[in-house]
């Protein structure tokens, strides 16, 4: 009986070790988000870089009083212009043709997430215009901020200029 128990324990340990060797050494490393469309990625990266430059021109690093409605309105104006640049970017990316089925399935989902993120940014503009200041709050998807999902897709497809801006993080 002891021999059977010992043999069972050895088999279980070897199986667990083999599973970890496979997981860390041999399992595929393909990202679920990777669409393998270099032409689409190149065009998207270029358009996102252009939008990032437009937003950089809007940057205002001055401090502002969170109790000053005029200062909040000024900040809202800047964010609104940045949002406009992002919306135009997303509209342009939507027009770029994707060459494969996986991309045709995933890119619209990514763009929909980006539009949700932009809706959150628009809500923040409305909050500032109302004279109230609070931290930027974004939609959570399965407990993850939507900007992280958007950024993960951008990183996995090597379109880092398309990572959402962190200009509202306080």
Name these PLM-found stretches:
Residues 6-24:
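Hydrophobic membrane-insertion alpha-helices, especially the h-region
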Residues 128-132:
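Amphipathic, charged alpha-helical scaffolds that flank and support histidine-based chemistry
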Residues 39-125, 135-170:
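Alpha-helical segments in soluble extracytoplasmic regions
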Residues 1-4:
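Short, Lys/Arg-rich N-terminal segment immediately upstream of the first membrane anchor
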């Amino acid at each position: 009986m002891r021999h059977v128990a010992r043999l069972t324990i050895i088999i279980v340990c070897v199986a667990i070790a083999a599973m970890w060797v496979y997981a860390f050494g041999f399992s595929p490393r393909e990202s679920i988000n990777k669409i393998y469309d270099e032409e689409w990625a190149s065009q998207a990266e270029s358009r996102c870089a252009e939008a990032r430059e437009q937003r950089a021109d809007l940057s205002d690093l001055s401090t502002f009083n969170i109790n000053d409605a005029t200062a909040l309105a000024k900040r809202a104006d800047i964010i609104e212009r940045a949002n406009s640049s992002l919306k135009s970017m997303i509209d342009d990316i939507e027009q770029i043709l994707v060459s494969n089925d996986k991309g045709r399935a995933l890119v619209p989902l990514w763009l929909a997430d980006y539009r949700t993120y932009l809706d959150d940014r628009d809500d923040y503009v409305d909050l500032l215009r109302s004279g109230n200041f609070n931290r930027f709050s974004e939609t959570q998807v399965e407990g993850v901020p939507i900007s992280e999902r958007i950024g993960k897709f951008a990183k996995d497809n090597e379109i880092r200029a398309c990572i959402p801006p962190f200009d509202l993080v306080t």
